[in-house]
């Protein structure tokens, strides 16, 4: 597999992570280096591990995974996106802070949801009979870098537009989930 192909696949896979990071950056204030590291590291790690998992399992579970992967991604993104929209409409409370998408189960759910497509890429790489290690490394690094860039851009948008960006970010997550669902059901 040549470098241009690997880079193209990496950028394409990182687009969902970038969009989610954009939404996360809009709701975290202030964004610290710790936030950037946590989300960038975890999104990159999951994006790198999923193709390896897909490659290792090969064709063994492809039919089972492909039957449900889009539902899993849709459910996770719709849940997190819906929660973001809900929190944006709640009354302002000085003691209440928005949930931090770079912590706990929210971060894990987002990491899984944005990297499920990378699992399918790993299955494809296995069918080509090539090594997965270089593509997985590049996929993870590109996802990590674009996640950090998305968070920083999201912060700028959040500072300028406030709750409107939080609502839009939540809706974007729901729409990404819907897009994944439609691509695997109606548009197949």
From Swiss-Prot:
Give the family this protein belongs to, as stated in its UniProt record. Belongs to the MntP (TC 9.B.29) family.
Q: What is this protein called?
A: Putative manganese efflux pump MntP
Q: Which GO terms describe its cellular component?
A: plasma membrane
Compartment(s) of residence: Cell inner membrane
Q: State if Cell wall biogenesis/degradation is listed as a keyword.
A: no
According to its UniProt entry, what is the function of this protein? Probably functions as a manganese efflux pump.
Question: What topology in the membrane does the UniProt record assign?
Answer: Multi-pass membrane protein
Annotated GO MF terms: manganese ion transmembrane transporter activity
Q: Which InterPro entries match?
A: Mntp/YtaF (IPR003810), Put_MntP (IPR022929)
User: Span of the secretion signal?
Assistant: none
Name of the encoding gene: mntP
Q: Which domain of life is it from?
A: Bacteria
């Amino acid at each position: 597999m040549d470098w241009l192909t690997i880079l193209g696949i990496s950028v394409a896979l990182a687009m969902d992570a970038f969009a989610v990071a954009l939404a996360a950056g809009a709701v975290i204030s202030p964004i610290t280096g710790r936030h950037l590291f946590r989300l960038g590291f975890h999104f990159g790690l999951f994006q790198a591990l999923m193709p390896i998992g897909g490659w290792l399992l090969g064709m063994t579970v492809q039919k089972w995974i492909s039957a449900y992967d889009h539902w899993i991604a849709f459910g996770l993104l719709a849940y997190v996106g819906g929660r973001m929209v809900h929190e944006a409409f709640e009354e302002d409370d000085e003691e209440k802070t928005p949930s931090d998408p770079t912590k706990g189960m929210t971060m894990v759910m987002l990491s899984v949801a944005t990297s499920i497509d990378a699992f399918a890429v790993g299955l494809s790489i296995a069918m080509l009979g090539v090594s997965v290690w270089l593509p997985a490394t590049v996929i993870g690094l590109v996802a990590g870098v674009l996640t950090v860039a998305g968070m920083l851009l999201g912060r700028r948008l959040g500072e300028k537009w406030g709750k409107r960006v939080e609502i839009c970010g939540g809706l974007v997550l729901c729409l990404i989930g819907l897009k994944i669902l439609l691509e695997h059901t109606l548009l197949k």
